[in-house]
Amino acid sequence: MTTNTTHDRQEPNEDDTEPTYTLGFVCVQNAGRSQMATAFAERERAKRGLEDAVEITTGGTHPAESVHDIVVEIMAEVDGGGIDLSDGTPREISTEVLHACDVVATMGCSTLELDADDVDVRDWALDDPDGADPETAKRIRDTVEERVTALFDEVEADLSESA
């Protein structure tokens, strides 16, 4: 994993009171790991009160038709009432969107080629939960959650330093 890096922030919109930090979560199909990462990131953003400061985007280079069943199943078991991904829809992500991110986390499967000096691209090198047994899929889920939490620790510290 890459070490913490300070990033240039996007200028705030007229309605914003804080600078915006943008995180991207990407994999090929956007049907497993990146969906879990996005869900955990949305939860972490709300828990830390960073809704106005952190934007989250996700997508795949070749999106699937739907979120993998095993991912929907194991995310429904997450502590605190579960996270419902049953209506999640994988989507394609453009290079333009990724260039607007401060950090892009790829899940270890991406064919992403992002040539941008101002984007911190991190390859989390996670196994694919699709086709995995439930225990393996849960371990992958837990690793995704840990990495998202650690990323938000960095983001929160970075935002505090620039405030």
Name each region found by the language model.
Residues 6-8, 103, 109-163:
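Phosphate-binding/catalytic loops
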Residues 2-92:
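Conserved active-site segments centered on acidic
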Residues 27, 107-108:
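A secondary-structure boundary/capping signal
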Residues 98-100:
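Alpha-helix C-terminal capping/helix-to-coil transition sites in glycosyltransferase folds
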